């Protein structure tokens, strides 16, 4: 083939060959000697070289330091490279720290600092507020989330636990049960488990320890402790007040079906005894005689009213769950205060965002707690005052987060969980409160609905409907 080429062709081939060799030499001079790098990695040599690269118009200074064992034994080694570029077009500094590329699975850390755009330092929380402004914002936001639900309670048309408000109160109790159970299992417990979750960027194939199961187990134990604490306190208070299990006495309806005899039902209700009827008749006759004489119709000893001791004991029992729920609400507000205080340490915008988030979930939470207090025997004003007292817990949590500078209380911005036991213990207390049948059910209808003896007209209607009402003394 060489014979077929003319002189011009041979000259062109020669020029191309020299050009290729020149490119190889330039590449060797501009990017380092690959052979020397390999020898350095294999044998642990260290060297320094400095050169000028006229193709790019900037200088490079490379420093390599290696201390490692032979790669054939699987030992790890590290490389530190420092590069200083003076370039007309770039003008920035790069600092690279990485492990050897010859061992797969090793991590790489790169830090780039561009002049004028920031400073490298330890990661922390940026504070854009001075101390006085920080406290003013944090405490003001805490007062807002505590006062807003208080004013919402004025719009609820429930004055007390009376038959007139029974239907609406039952709806509010159902709302409270769903809200508190959802808050316990979907907010408090997952938030307590979040710091112990695995990092999402963990590489598969690397060994990992199960030491993280200890904190997760402690969260479960604190939830169980909250449930047990509620049950123990509830039983203790009932025992002290003498509220043992008892029948609520007079006026409960009992339905009996007599299979085979009659398809109708017999309802046994308590009616006034003969002695009571005779005493009432005597009182009426004495009153009539006094009226004829122009005297007072009021009996000497005053009207005799039956004492419903069963209902009073029932009311005492119902208040236990209400006050225990109030204690759980106090602890819950403490964690809300921790979150607000820690978030404002991270900046004004983050604090405002966290305040709005807490406010949106706090309003329905407080409405549910209000319904439980009313159901437990409190009037509307008493329930509102007790709800307002729980704001002390939120203020205390905010102050704790600010005084500890985030610390353990608010190390996670917008989610400061405080001491590790607060969230799971509160969640267990709330779950136990709603699991108690006395917290989600209204007291039985008063006995006055069953005491009156049906008249002749009502008896006729009852006979037509097949229901027999029998009076028992």
Curated annotation (Swiss-Prot):
Pfam families (alphabetical): Zip
Pros-methylhistidine, modified sites: 66
Keywords: Endoplasmic reticulum, Golgi apparatus, Ion transport, Membrane, Methylation, Phosphoprotein, Transmembrane, Transmembrane helix, Transport, Zinc, Zinc transport
Modified residues (Phosphoserine): 278-279
Disulfide bond residue pairs: none
Localization terms from the record: Endoplasmic reticulum membrane; Golgi apparatus, cis-Golgi network membrane
Quaternary structure note: Homodimer.
Family listed: Belongs to the ZIP transporter (TC 2.A.5) family. KE4/Catsup subfamily.
Protein name: Zinc transporter SLC39A7
The organism of origin for this protein: Sus scrofa
Organism lineage string: Eukaryota, Metazoa, Chordata, Craniata, Vertebrata
